Amino acid sequence: ENTAPTEIPVIKQNAYPYNYVTCSQAQTLASGMVKSENYTSSLMFGVQWDLVLKYLETKGTAQADLKTDSASIGNYYDNLWEITNENSKYAPNGSGWTSGARGKKELNTSILLSTGASETFSKQGIYDIAGNVSEWTLEYTSNSYYPCANRGGVYSNNGDVYPAADRDNGTTTFYGTIIGFRVSLF
């Protein structure tokens, strides 16, 4: 079942993650989000992602939580959490959205969440920098078959496999429930 969002992407709590996009679709969508001569919108550059992680570290997030195992700060397969946010949404195995608080998640289960479903997954007001969906960036890899780069981790994998600092790759045609994007304004 396709769980692609039907809402306009926004930066706020309890929104559907904008997933099911290829890296080029993500850049097209991101660059068209702001219609202004004063601002530009784009996918995040890899260095911007790294600077956000460094900022979070200077504000008290442990380096190990960002670089080694992000299960304690993000939505991952191998962690336990309890969502009490009545305005949140969730999709077991990334399919079939349900509105309302999910309650307790069992260990080793895959549940896609709306943005900021838990304050635990919000660091300095930045939602879901670790886990939930991996995010396309403007980086390119050295692998010609997998030229597109994405950052962060996914709800269906472990926090020590794909921590917040992870830099992964994908094909130009890859899309799915586990990949989305984050917009930067400058």
Regions found by a protein language model. Give the residues of each.
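Short aromatic-cysteine micro-motif
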Residues: 1-128, 186
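Surface-exposed recognition segments
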Residues: 121, 129-186
